[in-house]
Amino acid sequence: MKKYLSFALAAALSAAFCATAFAAKDNRQVEVKTHIDPTYTVTIPANTTVGFGDVDTSFGAIKLTAAQLDPGKSVNVTLKSSGTLKNKNDTSKMLAYTIRSGESAFTSASYKKAGESTALTIHIEKDDWAKAYAGDYTDTVEFTISYK
């Protein structure tokens, strides 16, 4: 009986010391972040030769070929030219021209997403060709690209 009493006492003590352990709820938050610098690639027309007597010659296109821009920002391209081809042997002899997008003179454009482009044409009036002196003529066209 002593064994039985010892066993009962041990069982009672074990039951008395049993307790369910509860862990306190603990939530933590972490931040995941990255930064992407704005990047873009703009393609501009290459050197172009205008055939004698050609009123309209393709000048290629300005194209935003790749872009990761900030929201609300754009890539702006401005074109600057004298509008006059000068004779290499006598710079006082000139041939007027315009660079056009469609039927309008082109000066600038803004691009917001990759793939946007503006086709350009070099336009020389027939009358200007008729008045031009023989020789080689050149001018430089400057493209300014900015991010705003």
Annotate each language-model stretch with its function.
Residues 1-4:
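Positively charged n-region of N-terminal signal peptides that target proteins for export
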Residues 22-89, 106-148:
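N-terminal small/polar-rich segments of proteins
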Residues 15:
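Short, Gly/Pro- and small/polar-rich lid/capping loops
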